[in-house]
Amino acid sequence: MATNNTTEQSLTKKVWNLATTLAGQGIGFTDYITQLTYLLFLKMDAENVEMFGEESAIPDGYQWADLISLDGLDLVRQYEETLKLLSEQDNLIGTIYTKAQNKIDKPVYLKKVISMIDEEQWLIMDGDVKGAIYESILEKNGQDKKSGAGQYFTPRPLIKAMVDCIAPQIGETVCDPACGTGGFLLTAYDYMKGQSASKEKRDFLRNNALHGVDNTPLVVTLASMNLYLHGVGTDRSPIVCEDSLEKEPSTLVDVILANPPFGTRPAGSVDINRPDFYVETKNNQLNFLQHMMLMLKTGGRAAVVLPDNVLFEGGAGETIRKKLLTDFNLHTILRLPTGIFYAQGVKANVLFFTKGQPTKEIWFYDYRTDVKHTLATNKLERHHLDDFVSCYNNRVETFDAENNPQGRWRKYPVEAVSYTHLRAHETDSYL
């Protein structure tokens, strides 16, 4: 019998090989993975009916069996009618098929994708295997420079380190207001799922603990499917398709994990008019920071990837920073190197803060000086951040001007932190 690892590797290879074939026909990887998602959901629904006698969630006449028996233009027509109908449904199905459209209009290639999916039994496959296959496809999609999908994909080793530091606990609510393909939520779920054997707590974790928002329908589809394959949100997706910044948070949460989009708001976005915001600005990441500060419960914790300018920008940036330091404990800043994100040249940090107490001191971990990562030759791995996570948990300085000037971990009283110096020395990590 094949091991999980063998199954994962062979299936991933099969999926990638077909992606290469379709790319030769002008079908991009993003379009491919989207169609794969739509079809895989139909197949798993059919397996649920066949193996467990469950009632199909798909309306009669639009199920997997109605698709696999067809060829040629009849297949394309049936598929497109199915997508249209399912995009109008409620709950999980409506989310998975949000604004769904067929991007494989040549029947022979659509049939190839359907046949590949039909060869496997997906529902009984180990959830970790299904999830790992899908995650690997999402990562490959993130590498596709033409699609720009990298902006929705945060390196998983960084996510895992952030989650290990924040340490979400089962029973807590976790939100990512710019969730992309769901990496933070999924990693938080994996961290919490073994913490309790209580059915009540595990049901809460699967169905109510996680909350994600993204304003791109395609990304909402991918995130919802990613979580579904891991057993999360099987009735209703925890992902909502909307603009987080347009309205005040309806509920407060215990934990926020996020990497909000950098730069300005996309063309056509609604202007931000939030009376609850501390200051009005067109800076996207500053608005996300305000939104997240307002979303946290008292005592709530956040780990957020933000660009360098958030640390030193004047005007609105200074106003928000003062609020952050007064009403929150901004206790840790992880300075990141370039070369770890699919969007090249990004200078970023992870800000860790807790709501309810003012900041007295800030710990800085310099993972920028003399650190070089590239996606090709020295890709970031989780072990690269082991020292940071250990320092985060132990709070013992490793920097010593005389004995260990290369130490990366040191603290400053908040009044000693010079944001002007940070701006003047962007390549330096320490103040």
Residue ranges and their predicted role:
Residues 2-6, 247-429:
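A conserved structural/catalytic subdomain of Rossmann-like adenosyl-cofactor enzymes
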Residues 14, 27-31, 125, 154, ...:
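Generic detector of ordered secondary-structure context
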Residues 1-170, 235-244, 335-338, 359-368, ...:
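Non-catalytic, mostly N-terminal accessory regions of nucleic-acid modification and defense proteins
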Residues 148-258, 263-265, 274-276, 280-282, ...:
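Conserved S-adenosyl-L-methionine
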